[in-house]
């Protein structure tokens, strides 16, 4: 699979966005000791660019791998294989990532992230991928 390409079921009712990780990811604030707040650029498939903030909770088998929200994120390699879980107190973020964002690879300090859609792993290499349902009309 080429960098930046995605696999998804053709009949899935989805819109594909790509999250290009900022050259320096930013921890904006700490809600509590488990939560970090990140902002990414979104390149919409209609060539609109907006910024988006996604609060995420880092867990490993339901155990927090971050005891504190640090001023700098822990080594990215430590996150490979861990799930990125939207903060439960942010319904929008929970709805967007559906609690299934998974760090699947690390290349040159860039995260390759997959989204679990049912039993299918949707992988975007060197980008953040977001699959979200849409309604006709």
Swiss-Prot record:
Stretches that traverse the bilayer: 111-131
Compartments where located: Membrane
Superkingdom field: Eukaryota
Bilayer topology term: Single-pass membrane protein
UniProt KW Transmembrane helix keyword: yes
GO CC annotation: membrane
Keywords: Membrane, Transmembrane, Transmembrane helix
UniProt name for this protein: Uncharacterized protein YDR209C
């Amino acid at each position: 699979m080429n960098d930046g390409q995605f696999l998804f079921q053709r009949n899935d009712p989805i819109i594909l966005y790509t999250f290009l990780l900022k050259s320096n990811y930013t921890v904006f604030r700490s809600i509590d000791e488990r939560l970090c707040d990140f902002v990414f650029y979104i390149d919409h498939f209609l060539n609109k660019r907006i910024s988006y903030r996604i609060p995420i909770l880092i867990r490993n088998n339901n155990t927090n791998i971050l005891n504190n929200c640090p001023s700098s994120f822990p080594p990215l390699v430590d996150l490979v294989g861990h799930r990125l879980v939207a903060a439960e107190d942010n319904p929008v973020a929970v709805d967007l990532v559906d609690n299934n964002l998974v760090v699947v690879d690390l290349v040159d300090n860039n995260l390759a992230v997959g989204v679990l859609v049912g039993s299918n792993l949707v992988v975007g290499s060197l980008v953040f991928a977001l699959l979200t349902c849409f309604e006709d009309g």
